Amino acid sequence: MNNGFFNSDFDSIFRRMMQDMQGSNQVGNKKYYINGKEVSPEELAQLTQQGSNQSAEQSAQAFQQAAQRQQGQQGGNGNYLEQIGRNLTQEARDGLLDPVIGRDKEIQETAEVLSRRTKNNPILVGEAGVGKTAIVEGLAQAIVEGNVPAAIKDKEIISVDISSLEAGTQYRGAFEENIQKLIEGVKSSQNAVLFFDEIHQIIGSGATGSDSGSKGLSDILKPALSRGEISIIGATTQDEYRNNILKDAALTRRFNEVLVNEPSAKDTVEILKGIREKFEEHHQVKLPDDVLKACVDLSIQYIPQRLLPDKAIDVLDITAAHLSAQSPAVDKVETEKRISELENDKRKAVSAEEYKKADDIQNEIKSLQDKLENSNGEHTAVATVHDISDTIQRLTGIPVSQMDDNDIERLKNISNRLRSKIIGQDQAVEMVSRAIRRNRAGFDDGNRPIGSFLFVGPTGVGKTELAKQLAIDLFGNKDALIRLDMSEYSDTTAVSKMIGTTAGYVGYDDNSNTLTEKVRRNPYSVILFDEIEKANPQILTLLLQVMDDGNLTDGQGNVINFKNTIIICTSNAGFGNGNDAEEKDIMHEMKKFFRPEFLNRFNGIVEFLHLDKDALQDIVNLLLDDVQVTLDKKGITMDVSQDAKDWLIEEGYDEELGARPLRRIVEQQVRDKITDYYLDHTDVKHVDIDVEDNELVVKGK
């Protein structure tokens, strides 16, 4: 080929390039680098000679270490069990497990399933907090003590975390390889029993999708479980067992269910007594028997959404930790560190022949040692029932107090406190007070709400105000009142506002603003159904269950407890009854609006009477007290004459409308006029209110 590219010029360039390359290969032109640093040929030769004697030995050691690592990864199945699990039986031998009390029946059933020849795989099914894991630990202790069938007397229970099997499996087949090593490890040991907590996670665990061909953990374990080659203990909740395990019939038949129920209050007290020593040693706090019983009783009453014994143990642990933090105990670590520093200083002083200084240091060391020894016993805090009440109050926000003399007097005087705020409605106040006293003293049946009442009567007589005052007096906060205006619940879809929508409807996953969710978050509340006669009949049907059984099931199937609430319904039905109306007249009026089974659920139906002028005298004093509270923020005092009060009552009295017109008059004639006077006299410190020429006047000082 002859073209313009392959010409004589190109040939000369090529020959010159080849000559340069040959020159670079000469010894004098070679360059050597070690770890990125240029070295001379002489230095390279010296380093090579020094390393030649050790190279063979190092290579042999490196090969041996690599072989050991490979054997540990592939063939060391016994070590693999130790890497991914905890040997509960060994921990029981070492005394590291807490004692298990009152679970002999469940432990015996689990041991019987394990001793079977095939399908020897028990699964503990129970709600969260009832002690499923503790039963497995109790079984490990029973194996150590020899209180199990002969077939499992040599078994070792290995607790395996499923996530540890998935960790680091970034390549196809790595997860399956881990499972095979686990199975081979169990086979080779011949006495290992695997314990999977939250065993429902094995469904789909490790699978990467139906199209990839990757198998999940449950699919790999099924053949080995069926043949009895491995034995597994599982633990899960009722919901997870139903939603995951039972859907896989092949997996379900390989397990034998052991039902774990919540222990009784008596058994829970015994459980706390069994673990008391561990908590006392950990927190350095004494825990008497009455404290243990209070943990159980108060947790049952005030933490209904959780189960025993978990909630009682948590209350005990939190109380002991709080007392330990508050106790002026000696910091053991800091004291021992200080003693060590002084020992060094003493040795230096002796070396320097400063014997007087060394003697002083020795005295300080002895003082610290005595202080450390005394701190182990003399300064140990002792828990009381009041401490348990404080813990419950911190957890729930409810002002829990021990039933002492002061609290008994407070319960006795609850009607007087309410009567001072609710004027002219003594019958309603007394009925509500009796229900509260009965509940707080512990003499009600405990299943129904604290009280359920129907307040009927004209507008403006204190029905809603009584509900507000109850929330403040019982729960210390007016925000504990859940008020529902029944005019918003009159349509056919109103039920979804109460319990949330059911599956298949929009908003199923968002029930945050429903009544059931509000009660779940704040179980100690006063629930006010205002103007109940306007509600849809389906709402009244729901209330039948609440007032009778004390619970309600929301749209997602959760059972909400209402037994710590007070239910108050208000109605204007019976408005025409006068002060002398009998109870049968009230019931006759109520039957026009409500079904008999609804009325029969209430603890009491109370008619609120019309307010007379004598009652308004007390009401106007309360309204003026509210005005004074506002003036206190400005540093202003107020004095209202009796003539001014009488004038306000005359102007604001309306028998049909109750106290609301009086409130409006106080707003217009007192608050507004004080505001106008203050804007003209910003330095005022005192105001007098009186009547002149049939008008209210404000004078300041």
Curated annotation (Swiss-Prot):
The keyword Nucleotidyltransferase does not apply. Residues 336-371 form the UVR domain. Residues 45-81 are annotated as: Disordered. It comes from the Bacteria. Residues 49-72 have a biased composition (Low complexity). Keywords: ATP-binding, Chaperone, Nucleotide-binding. One of its GO terms (cellular component) is cytoplasm. It holds the Pfam family AAA_lid_9. Residues 383-575 are annotated as: II. InterPro entries: AAA+_ATPase, ATPase_AAA_core, Clp_ATPase_C, ClpA/B, ClpA/ClpB_AAA_lid, ClpA_ClpB, P-loop_NTPase. One of its GO terms (molecular function) is ATP binding. GO terms for biological process: cellular response to heat. Residues 81-332 are annotated as: I. CDD domains: AAA (cd00009), RecA-like_ClpB_Hsp104-like (cd19499). ATP binds at residues 126-133, 457-464. Belongs to the ClpA/ClpB family. ClpL subfamily. Required for the development of induced thermotolerance. This is ATP-dependent Clp protease ATP-binding subunit ClpL. It comes from Staphylococcus aureus (strain N315). The lineage of its organism: Bacteria, Bacillati, Bacillota, Bacilli, Bacillales. The gene is clpL.
